[in-house]
């Protein structure tokens, strides 16, 4: 409570984290490298979450890339102009997204003739994408 917190990344996890931090009495600065907040997020989810966040004094900084975290600040680079900005903060939360970890699938592909990776193991995305990839895999089973 009472801290200035930078949340780096504005996907759903970053926005939900922002909401909790706001509710706990913190001032939150949301930093997003993309030009828009919550890029690639379904607009219904984005609008719902932003409606809860915007009643607080949350700062949004789209188009900024995290360059460095210091003891009491974050240094950000504007993605268009390359200008650096220093924002004083007490805490930093990294919410930078996910990448699939599929080393097991790669190992199994060398041992078995038919291995299919589905869902977030092949590509991070939405639940609908994961279900669709699983359905496609099942339909290819002979």
Question: Which positions does each model-derived feature cover?
Answer:
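Rossmann-like dinucleotide/flavin-binding elements
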Residues: 1-41, 77-91, 95-142
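Short acidic, glycine/proline-enriched helix-loop-strand junctions
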Residues: 42-43, 49-50, 59
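Short, hinge-like loop/turn segments at secondary-structure boundaries
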Residues: 46-49, 134-136
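A conserved amphipathic helix/loop scaffold
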Residues: 52-53, 57, 108
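Residues that recognize and position ribonucleotide moieties
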Residues: 59, 67, 85-87
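A conserved short coil-to-beta-strand element within the FAD-binding core of flavoproteins
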Residues: 62-73
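Acidic, Ser/Thr-rich peripheral helices and adjacent loops at domain boundaries
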Residues: 49-52, 92
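General small-molecule cofactor/ligand-binding pocket signal
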Residues: 59-61, 116
């Amino acid at each position: 409570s009472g801290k200035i917190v930078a949340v780096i990344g504005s996907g759903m996890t970053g926005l939900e984290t922002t909401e909790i931090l706001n509710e706990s009495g913190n001032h939150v600065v949301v930093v997003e490298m993309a030009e828009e907040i919550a890029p690639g997020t379904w607009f219904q989810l984005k609008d719902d979450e932003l409606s809860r966040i915007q009643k607080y004094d949350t700062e949004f900084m789209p188009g900024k890339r995290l360059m460095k975290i210091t003891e009491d600040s974050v240094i950000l680079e504007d993605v268009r102009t390359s200008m650096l900005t220093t924002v004083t903060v007490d805490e930093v939360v990294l919410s930078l997204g996910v990448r699939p970890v599929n080393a097991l699938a790669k190992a199994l592909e060398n041992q078995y003739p038919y291995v299919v990776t589905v869902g977030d193991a092949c590509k991070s995305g939405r639940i609908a994408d994961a279900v669709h990839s699983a359905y496609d895999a099942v339909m290819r089973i002979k």
